[in-house]
């Protein structure tokens, strides 16, 4: 199963680590570079990078370039943990 992972808080990192430990097929990670909104903010890019998983920093997950990248990844499922914005139907 091809997994796209979306998150930017502590719980997001913990769950991503668990999926990596289980050798899940993670095809991409979407995270934020910074967040003043979340006190438990976590940048998932270093974890993705150290495990050779493609990643993207986004401000607006629903913008065209991000949707295009998601389509290229062809995920079977999206795991979204700790993301403070709604995903539009084009992503789902």
Residue ranges and their predicted role:
Residues 1-92:
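One-carbon transfer enzymes
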């Amino acid at each position: 199963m091809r997994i796209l992972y979306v998150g930017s808080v502590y719980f997001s990192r913990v769950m991503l680590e668990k999926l990596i430990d289980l050798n899940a097929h993670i095809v991409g990670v979407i995270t934020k570079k910074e967040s003043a909104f979340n006190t438990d903010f976590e940048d998932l890019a270093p974890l993705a990078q150290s495990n050779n998983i493609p990643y993207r920093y986004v401000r607006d997950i629903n913008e065209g370039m991000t949707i295009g990248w998601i389509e290229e990844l062809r995920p079977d499922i999206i795991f979204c943990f700790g993301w403070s914005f709604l995903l539009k139907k084009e992503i789902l």
